[in-house]
């Protein structure tokens, strides 16, 4: 099948950058004698200058402007550099993000943005709105007289009472919030209601 007569040069698949026309003589396999002729001269100098000798005549390889300009996406950016460039932007807001919030007796989890709250009072108001329950704000302010207690998991995996540390430290270390019944919250330094020391 002859390609020249059918005009299939445009649709021919080639290995190389798009928009670069390479002489058809260079695309075909070369015979041993042609390889010896090109290697007899300083082949690397001729290739760098764009002059290719084959059989004694010299011809200039055409480089189109598209081939000279940088191809989009080349050179490939290492995934390590991509991840680190994203981390630099996110490290300015350390700890500010969405955390999971669970409540005892509620069969679903919620997520909330801690960065939107300005302090523990705003957090209590947001949690009240989130679960439609009016006891969470009281639990954060006056934990002794409430049925529920708000605890959080810090970076180390320890569960601590919300409100015991300054707000900035809470934002940096909070990974998860849990609103649990006071009777179930053993081991947090809490006593059941009505029990005096």
Swiss-Prot record:
InterPro entries: AUX/IAA_dom, AUX_IAA, PB1-like. Residues 96-184 form the PB1 domain. Residues 35-67 are annotated as: Disordered. It comes from the Eukaryota. Induction: Up-regulated by auxin. Up-regulated by phototropism in hypocotyls, with a higher level on the shaded side. Aux/IAA proteins are short-lived transcriptional factors that function as repressors of early auxin response genes at low auxin concentrations. Repression is thought to result from the interaction with auxin response factors (ARFs), proteins that bind to the auxin-responsive promoter element (AuxRE). Formation of heterodimers with ARF proteins may alter their ability to modulate early auxin response genes expression. This is Auxin-responsive protein IAA19. It comes from Arabidopsis thaliana (Mouse-ear cress).
């Amino acid at each position: 099948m002859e390609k020249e007569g059918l005009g299939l040069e445009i649709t021919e698949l080639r290995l190389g950058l798009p928009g670069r026309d390479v002489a058809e003589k260079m695309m075909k396999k070369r015979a041993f004698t042609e390889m010896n002729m090109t290697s007899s001269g300083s082949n690397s100098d001729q290739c760098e200058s764009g002059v290719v000798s084959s059989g004694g005549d010299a011809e200039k390889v055409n480089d189109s402007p598209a081939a000279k300009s940088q191809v989009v996406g080349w050179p490939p950016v290492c995934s390590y550099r991509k991840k680190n460039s994203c981390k630099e932007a996110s490290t300015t807001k350390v700890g500010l993000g969405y955390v999971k919030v669970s409540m005892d007796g509620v069969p679903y989890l919620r997520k909330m943005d801690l960065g939107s709250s300005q302090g523990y009072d705003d957090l209590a108001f947001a949690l009240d709105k989130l679960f439609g329950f009016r006891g969470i704000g009281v639990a954060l302010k006056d934990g002794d007289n409430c049925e529920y207690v708000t605890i959080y998991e810090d970076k180390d995996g320890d569960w601590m009472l919300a409100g015991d540390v300054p707000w900035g430290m809470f934002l940096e270390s909070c990974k998860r919030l849990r609103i649990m019944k006071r009777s179930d919250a053993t081991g947090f330094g809490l006593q059941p209601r009505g029990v005096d020391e």
